[in-house]
Structure formats: C-alpha cells, structure tokens
C-alpha cells in the first residue's frame, strides 16, 4: 500500500501546520501586546498632562484664596471707616443740636 508519499512526510506536514498555527497565535498575541503597551504609554502621557493641569489649578486656587482674603480684609477696614465716619457725623450733629437748644 504505497501512495507515493512517505509516511514521515504526512507527520511533518501536520507538525508544520501546528507550528504555523502556533506562530500565528504568537504573532497575534504580540500584536495585541504592542497595542496594549501603546495604550498604556498614551494613558501615562494623558495622566501626566492631567497631573500638570491639576498642579496649575491648585496653584491658581491658592493664589485666588490669598487674593480673596486680602480683599476681604481691605473692605472690612473700609466698612469700619465708614461706620466711624457715620458715628462721628451723628455725634457732631447731636452736639450742634444740644448747643443750639441750650443757647
């Protein structure tokens, strides 16, 4: 029963086919891993940019807080001055009325 093809050749062809399938699977996994690595690097870059933006925002918030505190203090003193002026004017008017009524 000779078919013209040695029996060892059939085994080698099957082995080559399995080897090729395995190589294709390895290539597919390598491609997937390359895509994953690219995504990780891209994500790292975006996180780094986000961290920089967060730092800048924090610095801006600190500066705003300082400016707001200074402004609050400034207008508190202005308010105190206005109250002092108003009370002084009222006292002067009362003194004038008392002096005018007594004379």
Curated annotation (Swiss-Prot):
Q: Where is this cross-link: Glycyl lysine isopeptide (Lys-Gly) (interchain with G-Cter in ubiquitin)?
A: 70, 72, 81
Q: Where are the residues of the annotated region Disordered?
A: 1-25
- Give the UniProt family note: Belongs to the synaptobrevin family.
**Any keyword Cytoplasm?**
no
Q: Which residues lie on this side of the membrane: Vesicular?
A: 103
Database matches in Gene3D superfamilies: 1.20.5.110
* GO (cellular component) term, any one: clathrin-coated vesicle membrane
Q: Where are the transmembrane segments?
A: 82-102
Gene Ontology BP terms = calcium-ion regulated exocytosis; cellular response to type II interferon; establishment of localization in cell; Golgi to plasma membrane protein transport; negative regulation of secretion by cell; positive regulation of receptor recycling; protein-containing complex assembly; retrograde transport, endosome to Golgi
Q: Residue limits of the v-SNARE coiled-coil homology domain?
A: 18-78
Q: Taxonomic lineage of this organism?
A: Eukaryota, Metazoa, Chordata, Craniata, Vertebrata
Compartment list:
Early endosome membrane; Recycling endosome membrane; Synapse, Synaptosome
Domain of life, per lineage: Eukaryota
Q: Which InterPro entries match?
A: Synaptobrevin-like, Synaptobrevin/VAMP, V_SNARE_CC
> Which residues are exposed on the Cytoplasmic face of the membrane?
1-81
Keywords assigned: Coiled coil, Endosome, Isopeptide bond, Membrane, Protein transport, Synapse, Synaptosome, Transmembrane, Transmembrane helix, Transport, Ubl conjugation
Q: What is this protein called?
A: Vesicle-associated membrane protein 3
In which tissues is this gene expressed?
Answer: Ubiquitous.
What is the topology of this protein in the membrane according to its UniProt annotation?
Single-pass type IV membrane protein
Give the Gene Ontology MF terms in alphabetical order. SNAP receptor activity; SNARE binding; syntaxin-1 binding
Q: Which residues of this protein are annotated with the site description (Microbial infection) Cleavage?
A: 44-47, 63-64
Cite the record's note on assembly.
Interacts with POPDC1 (via the C-terminus cytoplasmic tail). Interacts with BCAP31; involved in VAMP3 export from the endoplasmic reticulum. Interacts with BAIAP3; this interaction is increased in the presence of calcium. Interacts with PICALM.
**Reported function:** SNARE involved in vesicular transport from the late endosomes to the trans-Golgi network.
The PTM entry states: Ubiquitinated by RNF167 at Lys-70, Lys-72 and Lys-81, regulating the recycling endosome pathway. (Microbial infection) Targeted and hydrolyzed by C.botulinum neurotoxin type D (BoNT/D, botD) which hydrolyzes the 46-Lys-|-Leu-47 bond and probably inhibits neurotransmitter release.
Q: Entry's Pfam families?
A: Synaptobrevin (PF00957)
């Amino acid at each position: 029963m000779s078919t013209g093809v040695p029996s060892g050749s059939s085994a080698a062809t099957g082995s080559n086919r399995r080897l090729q399938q395995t190589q294709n699977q390895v290539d597919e996994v390598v491609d997937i891993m390359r895509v994953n690595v690219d995504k990780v690097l891209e994500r790292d870059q975006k996180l780094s940019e986000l961290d920089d933006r967060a730092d800048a925002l924090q610095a801006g918030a600190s500066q705003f807080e300082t400016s707001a505190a200074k402004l609050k203090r400034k207008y508190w003193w202005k308010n105190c001055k206005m109250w002092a002026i108003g009370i002084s004017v009222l006292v002067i008017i009362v003194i004038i009325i008392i002096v005018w009524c007594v004379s």
